[in-house]
Structures are given as C-alpha cells and as structure tokens.
C-alpha cells in the first residue's frame, strides 16, 4: 500500500466529501426537526386504513417514535440514494479517472505495483464511506437527542447505521469493481451505477 497515494487521494476528495456531508446535514436536520409524536399516531391510524398505499412507499409501519420516523423518511430512500451517488463519483475519481486520462501508467511506473495501488484505492474508498456514515450517525444523534430532546434506542440506531454502512460498501463495490474492469468511462461508471440502481428499485 502506498501511504503517499493514500494521503493524496484523501486530500483530493475532501471537497466532494464535504459537499455530500452538507447534503446529508440539510436533509437530515430538516427531516429530523419535522418529527411530531402526535402526527406519528395519526399516521399509524391512516396506515391502517390504507395499508396498500403506505406499503407502496415502503411505509408499512410508520411508527410513532423518533427512530421509526427516521427509518421511514431518511433511511428508506435519502440515506441510500445520496451515499450511493457519492460511491459512483468516488469510484470515478479513484479508478476510472486514471484509466480514462491514461495517467494510470504514471502510477504503475512508481515502485508500487498494481496490487499495492489497488489496495490503497480500496482503503481510501472504505475510509471515505466510514467518515460519511460516522458523520451521519453523529448528526442524527445530535439532532434527535439535543435539538428535539427525543430519546432514541441507541443500540438499535447504531446497528441500523452499521447495516447502512455495509449496504453502501456493497453497492459501492459494484461501482468500484466496474471501474476496475472497463477501460471506457461509459461502461466503467454506467455498469456499476446501473446495477446499483436496479438493486435500489
């Protein structure tokens, strides 16, 4: 593994990471602050009267707690889509960009071989996702317990975020693998992103 390449990649992707953190902050804060336990009770009654409609939007059980609310309105779609787009762009910057611009040859001319370079890019990929998911967890914990003063089932919330991290590593690995296999940018990004979106649908 190349520590120099690791530091360079982490620095070069800071701006993109901050943009996605800002997006998650915007959606996460706004949606968390929308929580109202009384509305939750009303939504439960509405879900009982129209179960098919709520099931179509992935809300079979709207719930009445803060965690149920977050699962339905954040974890059901937004916190899957935004980090997945991050995975697509990160796969491009870590692998596909070098292949597309022909600069992979310069990396291979260093003392590090293909295996070491690939290992470094994988470590960067996992670290970037870990930072994003850790930030998301801390943000939602802060918004719900400090700003809204609502109690969360901490361990259930933690397991939920660990599961989300694992899901994004899986979806992101499809994009990363696709970027490694194909030389042309339309295939390297298109195949991984396309398969990932099929999983989401």
Feature locations, PLM:
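Interfacial loop/helix-cap signal at membrane boundaries in integral membrane proteins
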Residues: 48-74
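Long, hydrophobic alpha-helical segments
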Residues: 71-96
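Transmembrane helix segments
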Residues: 29-37, 185-201
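Aromatic- and glycine-rich beta-strand/loop motifs that create alpha-glucan
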Residues: 1-24
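Transmembrane helix boundary and interhelical loop/hinge segments in multi-pass membrane proteins
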Residues: 88-108, 122
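Short coil/turn motifs that cap or connect alpha-helices
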Residues: 113-114
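Interfacial/capping segments of alpha-helical transmembrane domains
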Residues: 32-54
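Secretory targeting signals
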Residues: 29-32, 119-171, 175-180
């Amino acid at each position: 593994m190349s520590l120099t390449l690791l530091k360079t990649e982490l620095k070069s992707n800071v701006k993109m990471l901050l943009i996605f953190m800002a997006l998650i902050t915007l959606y996460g804060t706004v949606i968390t602050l929308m929580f109202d336990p009384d509305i939750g009770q009303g939504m439960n009654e509405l879900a009982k009267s129209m179960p098919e409609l709520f099931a179509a939007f992935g809300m079979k059980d709207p719930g009445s707690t803060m965690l149920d609310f977050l699962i339905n309105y954040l974890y059901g779609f937004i916190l899957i889509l935004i980090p997945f787009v991050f995975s697509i762009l990160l796969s491009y910057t870590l692998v596909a960009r070098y292949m597309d611009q022909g600069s992979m040859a310069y990396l291979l001319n260093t003392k590090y071989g293909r295996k070491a370079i690939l290992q470094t890019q994988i470590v960067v990929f996992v670290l970037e996702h870990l930072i994003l998911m850790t930030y998301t967890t801390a943000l939602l914990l802060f918004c719900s317990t400090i700003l809204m003063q609502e109690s969360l089932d901490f361990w259930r919330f933690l397991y939920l975020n660990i599961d989300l991290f694992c899901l994004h590593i899986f979806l992101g690995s499809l994009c990363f693998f696709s970027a490694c296999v194909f030389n042309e940018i339309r295939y390297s990004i298109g195949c991984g992103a396309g398969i990932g979106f099929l999983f989401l649908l």
